[in-house]
Amino acid sequence: MDRVVLPFKPRFIVYYCGSNDVNGKEGATGIVERITQFNDRVHAVLPQTRVFFVAIQRAPDKRARWAVVDSVNATLKATAARSSYITYLDLNPVLFDRTGAVRSELYKPDSLHFLPPAYVEFTAIIKPALEQAWANKR
């Protein structure tokens, strides 16, 4: 963080974190703590910077760990709702169809990594949030 984020004094930080950690032994609490540390450090050093946290994805490959994913996401969503500088971006809804089935066409064969059409869907959520924040910053 000290070399790749803070020196540049960004107005906005969009980041995705915690996906690999859901397979670990520490559980949701440890993941939330590390993400919170990042957010708190950014805010302490760069109080004008907006943080956009992208929710951990409910990838089919991690189905056995969705309870951890959901717990982390719910906690971070609640944190963002109380925060003046954190925006929670949930991309999970576009990964499922109306019946709740996984949209497998968005995933590579490993059922974890995304294909280009998924990024088109993500852009439709992330871009408006950034545009709105940019307009409000001026």
Predicted region positions:
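Alpha-helical cap/lid subdomain in secreted, periplasmic
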Residues: M1-R138
